[in-house]
Amino acid sequence: MTNTRKNHPLMKIINNSFIDLPTPPNISSLWNFGSLLGACLTIQVITGLFLAMHYTADTTTAFSSVTHICRDVNYGWTIRYLHANGASMFFMCLFIHVGRGLYYGSFALLETWNIGIMLLFSVMATAFMGYVLPWGQMSFWGATVITNLLSAIPYVGTNLVEWIWGGFSVGKPTLTRFFALHFILPFIISALAMIHLLFLHETGSNNPLGMSSNSDKIPFHPYYTTKDFLGLLLLILLLMTLTLFYPDLLGDPDNYTPANPLNTPPHIKPEWYFLFAYAILRSIPNKPGGVVALILSILILAIIPFLQPSKQQTMMFRPLSQFLFWILVADLLTLTWIGGQPVENPFISIGQTASILYFSLMVFIMPMTCLIENKMLKW
């Protein structure tokens, strides 16, 4: 008798990816976040689909339709806040996932790492467009400020911005196209995630020691399915706590005011997960420089594999690099805090210092430390 799980064309793919997949026996809970991101994406697609059934992408009715979802649709408020806070969970898992990749040297798996960077950009674009859809004050002004950054591109900038807007300012065409793109992008993200997994399974997972585990593997099921399920329960617990007890904790009160092009909010800021990049953007006084720094703040991840001369893949046995890694984390938290503050001293100077430190750590300090650690191996 043949085993359907191992011979059926479709089941075989699932089996080789989630059941009989040979896995290192020593990967920690930090490796759970890949599956948690998959769970977040599923939650976002399902809640988003139900929201799209009631939402209208029109400047005159968008705000009212969101109010209608919260007041009149059965459990509409739950779906709306699950979707909004689900995005926060998504980014929390993303940042930990990327941080784990940096700490344990997973960037050595180049194809997987580069697809991951593409995924990060796609998720950020999707979240930005989703924030515009409720058509509150922060939605409108956030869309205006961020899309306006493209005008810093020489020659074509202004035309490009007007092309994206579909007019001479953010309006109905902008909202309609943002809704269309916000709807389609998660499916593109799903496809990219599958390619991400495909490349990962070509080489196999990294592990905390950074050593080859080919001589000692265990099947993914039941060991890691159980472990991932525990992580999923904790994620759902946190998401439901946020949604049911503190639904507006991470939102902006300004977004409960309908969009008004004639009234600018005191200080425009994006959602918390973009604040670190926003702080880097604001720390540079001229527009083109700020835009370049903003893009480089994420794109710098692509050159990390070429800036790591260390003879050990992970930071597990490299205390100097560990110390610098946690300084980098503290620096990013500082940038996140600064991004939410008004543009005045001392916040300007703190933001500039933190931005310089961020790029210095990534490009100079950490690679130099790797060279010192290589020397220390010979002592």
UniProtKB/Swiss-Prot annotation:
Heme 1 (or BL or b562) is low-potential and absorbs at about 562 nm, and heme 2 (or BH or b566) is high-potential and absorbs at about 566 nm. It is a multi-pass membrane protein. Its cofactor is heme b. Binds 2 heme b groups non-covalently. SUPFAM superfamilies: a domain/subunit of cytochrome bc1 complex (Ubiquinol-cytochrome c reductase) (SSF81648), Transmembrane di-heme cytochromes (SSF81342). CDD domains: cytochrome_b_C, Cytochrome_b_N. It is found in: Mitochondrion inner membrane. A ubiquinone binds at H201. This is Cytochrome b. Heme b b562 binds at H83, H182. Coiled coil: none annotated.
